[in-house]
A protein has these predicted regions:
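Conserved catalytic/switch belt of AAA+ P-loop NTPases
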Residues: 6-22
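Conserved AAA+/SF3 P-loop NTPase catalytic/coupling segment centered on the Walker-B
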Residues: 1-9, 30-32
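Charged, glycine-rich active-site and insertion segments that engage polyanionic ligands
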Residues: 17-20, 26-179
Length: 179
């Protein structure tokens, strides 16, 4: 709340000697600009191996045994993976049984992205992963790149103009997944 931020600002602006603060922030929520302006920002990205290691420690299980290898990217965060598992557990979805295409189809057909912003963000990441995998295995790289570029523009416009994601995802499914 605003009172807590004001108290934190006062402490940060007038610290005792030899006292340093490390503030850890989740990007899903914004920090007030007045607090952010007094901070040095370090963006930390984990390697794939480190991400898996951290996730395994948090879960107490091996994440690689719970999710199909096609659903992993080098850009997953432990939070992404845990959110994906929580989502799957709530809906009793066995992520080990779904290929990337099958999982994309499931998310779109059941409109899970409408009820959960995290799932919408994961769906967008899975769409990018789909294009990357398709690009890596195809001989017609220009076609895949053009489709990818077209959908990036559509995603950007959907965000920019606050358009409906349903039509975007249905178009992706009909033109790209089934096309």
């Amino acid at each position: 709340n605003i009172n807590a931020v004001n108290a934190l600002l006062k402490i940060v602006e007038e610290p005792n000697e030899n006292i340093f603060f490390i503030l850890i922030h989740n990007n899903e929520k914004s920090i007030l600009s007045t607090l952010r302006s007094r901070c040095l920002t370090f963006k930390i990205n984990l390697s794939f191996t480190k991400c898996i290691e951290v996730t395994n420690k948090l879960l107490g299980k091996n994440i690689l045994d719970l999710i199909n290898h096609e659903l992993f990217t080098n850009y997953n965060t432990p939070g992404d993976l845990i959110n994906l598992l929580d989502f799957a557990n709530e809906r009793k979805i066995n992520l080990k049984k779904y290929s990337l295409v099958e999982f994309l189809t499931l998310l779109i057909d059941n409109s899970y992205y409408k009820k959960n912003k995290t799932i919408k963000d994961l769906l967008l990441n899975f769409i990018e992963l789909f294009f990357l995998k398709k690009y890596n295995i195809t001989d017609n790289k220009n076609s895949v790149f053009n489709n990818y570029h077209e959908f990036l523009l559509k995603i950007n416009n959907t965000n920019k103009f606050n358009l409906d994601y349903e039509s975007l995802f249905l178009e992706f499914k009909s033109k790209i997944l089934n096309g």
